[in-house]
């Protein structure tokens, strides 16, 4: 069990997870864990051929996130220091279930549980829920070359997958707090009041 608040920002590709996590980290002075996306050597290949490279991609992410969370537990959470992350480790399962073959998925889930069962889990999730047009606009705006290859149908599937996953996480942990942010109507970057409403919920958690 965590000895300190562990906050995860989640949502589909382009929802604004890292942006919001960074803003909250700066406001409250929390250490931040952010996933290393562009350093994944399989990412560009993955969007060229999802079937061929999905297992390698997901294993890279899993191992990298495992190390991050292990270090975070030792250096911060066990010492009572709140932490914010721009992902929940369960996102590995969300993406793996979407892209891996049944045979690969069976192997992957065994490794996933072996690595993550004793890792700290977030006790507060901020879920940024956004529609396809919003995600496409934000993906285009940030201009990552490999994301230009993302198919619209893949994003649509992820939107649905995230809805299911958030419900699963809540059912698995009744004490988990989930704050859903409407990413279509709320602009926490340009509208200070939208950000402050989110920050107020975080403040309630840590006082």
Swiss-Prot record:
Catalytic activity: 2'-deoxyguanosine + ATP = dGMP + ADP + H(+)
Gene3D superfamilies given in the database record: P-loop containing nucleotide triphosphate hydrolases
Entry's EC annotation: 2.7.1.113
Active site per the UniProt annotation: 86 (proton acceptor)
A single Gene Ontology CC term: cytoplasm
Pfam families attached to this UniProt entry: dNK
Molecular function as annotated in GO: ATP binding; deoxyguanosine kinase activity; deoxynucleoside kinase activity
Protein keywords: ATP-binding, Kinase, Nucleotide-binding, Transferase
Binding residues annotated for ATP, in chain numbering: 11-19
Residues binding substrate, per UniProt: 35, 47, 147
Top-level lineage group: Bacteria
Note: Catalysis proceeds by a classical ping-pong bi-bi reaction mechanism.
Name of the molecule in the record: Deoxyguanosine kinase
Species this protein is from: Bacillus subtilis (strain 168)
């Amino acid at each position: 069990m965590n000895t300190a608040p562990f906050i995860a920002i989640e949502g589909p590709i382009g929802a604004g997870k890292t942006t919001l996590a960074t803003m909250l980290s700066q406001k409250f002075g929390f250490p931040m864990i952010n996933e290393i996306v562009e350093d994944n050597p399989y990412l560009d290949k993955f969007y060229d051929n999802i079937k061929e490279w999905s297992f390698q991609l997901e294993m890279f992410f899993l191992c990298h996130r495992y190390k991050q969370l292990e270090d975070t537990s030792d250096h911060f959470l066990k010492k009572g220091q709140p932490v914010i992350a721009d992902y929940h480790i369960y996102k590995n399962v969300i993406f793996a279930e979407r892209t891996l073959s049944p045979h690969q998925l069976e192997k992957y889930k065994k490794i996933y549980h072996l690595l993550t069962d004793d890792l700290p889990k977030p006790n507060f999730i901020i879920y940024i829920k956004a529609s396809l047009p919003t995600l496409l606009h934000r993906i285009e705006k940030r201009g990552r070359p490999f994301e230009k290859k993302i198919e619209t149908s893949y994003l649509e599937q992820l939107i649905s997958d995230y809805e299911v996953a958030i419900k699963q996480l809540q059912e698995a942990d009744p004490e988990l707090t989930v704050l859903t942010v409407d990413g279509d109507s709320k602009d926490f970057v340009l509208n200070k009041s939208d950000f402050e409403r989110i920050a107020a919920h975080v403040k309630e958690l840590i006082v």
